[in-house]
């Protein structure tokens, strides 16, 4: 039933799943097995894990203040590609395509953490590079909060607030295009998508 689906992972996760799997114009089959799989892979291990890791590192290494840093080309390019893909998808009411743009940026940002190894940069006292990495991750999260707002409004708002941003992410398209977040005070939110 709908009630048990909402209880299982929350209303935003169900909304995301239905938009991603079915959209507006398609018939779809719902299974708890598929709902659980998408929740775990894309939300808990994807967006939730990214937000948790990135915000925890900004807290740990920079006292919760987003540093100013140069552009991290690979992550910036991924963010711009995600924005373009998302805009095209939403203009065509392709909600699955919009969700795929979000997942693509989440995947890129999680991979960026692995490759850039902020913990190693901190240990090596490479402050300039660490600042650039943390700033790039914060910018990616701003973009993700804006992109997620139509599909998961409550979770996007929680991420937006954790990023120290005023207002709501659904009014932030310009912020997604040019995320100026340096100097913002971030807090690690309560786990956005708890793992089962």
Short names for language-model regions:
Residues 5-6, 35-46, 71-79, 91-101, ...:
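Secondary-structure capping and boundary motifs in well-ordered enzyme cores
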Residues 27-32, 80-88:
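Short, charged/polar, low-complexity loop and linker segments
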Residues 28, 88, 93-94, 103-196:
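Basic, alpha-helical terminal appendages of large translation-related enzymes
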Residues 51-86, 110-126:
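Conserved, charged catalytic cores of large soluble enzymes
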């Amino acid at each position: 039933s709908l009630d048990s689906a909402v209880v299982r992972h929350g209303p935003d996760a169900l909304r995301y799943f239905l938009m991603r799997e079915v959209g507006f114009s398609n018939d779809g089959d719902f299974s708890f097995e598929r709902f659980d799989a998408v929740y775990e892979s894309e939300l808990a291990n994807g967006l939730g894990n990214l937000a948790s890791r990135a915000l925890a590192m900004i807290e740990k290494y920079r006292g919760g203040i987003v540093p100013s840093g140069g552009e991290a080309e690979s992550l910036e390019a991924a963010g711009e590609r995600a924005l373009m893909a998302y805009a095209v998808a939403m203009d065509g009411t392709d909600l699955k395509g919009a969700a795929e743009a979000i997942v693509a940026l989440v995947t890129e940002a999680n991979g960026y953490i692995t490759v850039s190894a902020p913990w190693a940069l901190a240990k090596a006292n490479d402050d300039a590079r660490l600042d650039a990495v943390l700033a790039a991750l914060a910018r990616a999260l701003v973009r993700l909060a804006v992109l997620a707002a139509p599909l998961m409004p409550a979770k996007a708002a929680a991420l937006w607030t954790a990023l120290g941003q005023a207002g709501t992410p659904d009014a932030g398209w310009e912020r997604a295009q040019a995320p100026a977040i340096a100097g913002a005070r971030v807090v690690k939110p309560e786990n956005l998508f708890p793992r089962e």
